[in-house]
Structures are given as C-alpha cells and as structure tokens.
C-alpha cells in the first residue's frame, strides 16, 4: 500500500499499479497535452515543464510521460482513428475534449494493459472535471464507438 497525500492508504492492484496515482497522471497529462495544443509548443519542452511540476505532486510519473509522449508522437494517427466517430473536424472539437479524446485514443491503441472500460471511465471523469458542461457525454460517445473498433475482441468478449 502507498500513502497518498490528503488521504489514507491507497490500495494497489495485484500488478502493482496504484489507480489513484494513474488518475492523477492522466489529469496532469491532459494539462500538458492541452498546453501543447494551445501553445503549439515543442513537445520536449512541454513534457519537461510538466514533468518538473509532476515531481511535486504524488502521481505516476512514468505513466504521465508515456501518455504525453505517446499523444504528441502519434497525434496524427490518433486523430485519424477518432475522425470516423466525430460529428465535426478534430480542430472544431473543444480543446479540452480534444485533449481528452487524444489521450483516450492513445490508451485504447497503445496501452492494452489498461481495460477499455477504465480508459473510457477515466476520460469521462477527466472531461467532467475540466471540460464543458456536457463535454463528458461527447467524450463518452466518441470513445465508446472508437473502443468497439479498436478493441473489438475485448469489447464484445
């Protein structure tokens, strides 16, 4: 068990993953991807800035870096995978929801160790916290349909 600031012990899964720390890493990754989208910044600078701040917040730094580097590296591919499920161009999607969708698509494609239901639920919770009033419902609909295509065996199994 690990101690999380402001709370009691946080149970780890059998594989050693602490879900609370992963959730924090996702929230920080959202902020980094959002900053990158808005500023058009250099990927390495954005990661370095947020990784430095991340060190002061209890979170899964390795997972944070994987998410941010993965989204920034595979952004065009992620957008291509999301496009069939959008009702507008990716550029027209609200910047927060766009960042959440890209992070969710990255996890669906490249983090097979994370169940698709966890990916979608975490994306919904993040969109509720940071996005527009109904942004989480849009994120849910898009990622739910994307999961069916990207992880068909897992979703239908």
Curated annotation (Swiss-Prot):
Give GO cellular component annotations, separated by semicolons.
Answer: cytosol
The record's keywords, sorted A to Z, are:
RNA-binding, Transcription, Transcription antitermination, Transcription regulation
Q: Which GO molecular-function terms appear in the entry?
A: RNA binding
Q: Pfam families of this UniProt entry?
A: NusB
Kindly list the biological process annotations in GO that this record carries: DNA-templated transcription termination; transcription antitermination
Under the heading SUPFAM superfamilies, the entry gives: NusB-like
The record's HAMAP family line, in alphabetical order, gives: NusB (MF_00073)
Family the entry assigns: Belongs to the NusB family.
Q: What does this protein do?
A: Involved in transcription antitermination. Required for transcription of ribosomal RNA (rRNA) genes. Binds specifically to the boxA antiterminator sequence of the ribosomal RNA (rrn) operons.
What name does this protein carry? Transcription antitermination protein NusB
User: What is the source species?
Assistant: Xylella fastidiosa (strain M12)
Gene name linked to the record = nusB
């Amino acid at each position: 068990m690990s101690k999380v600031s402001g709370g009691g012990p946080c149970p780890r899964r059998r594989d050693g993953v602490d879900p609370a720390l992963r959730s924090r890493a996702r929230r920080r990754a959202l902020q980094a991807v959002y900053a990158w989208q808005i500023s058009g910044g250099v990927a390495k600078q954005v990661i370095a800035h947020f990784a430095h701040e991340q060190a002061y917040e209890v979170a899964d730094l390795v997972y944070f870096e994987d998410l941010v580097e993965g989204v920034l590296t595979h952004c065009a591919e992620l957008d291509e995978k999301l496009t069939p499920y959008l009702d507008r161009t990716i550029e027209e999607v609200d910047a927060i929801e766009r960042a959440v969708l890209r992070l969710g698509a990255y996890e669906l494609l490249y983090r097979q160790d994370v169940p698709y239901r966890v990916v979608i639920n975490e994306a919904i919770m993040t969109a509720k916290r940071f996005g527009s009033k109904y942004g989480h419902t849009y994120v849910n609909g898009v990622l739910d349909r994307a999961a069916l295509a990207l992880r068909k065996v897992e979703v239908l199994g």
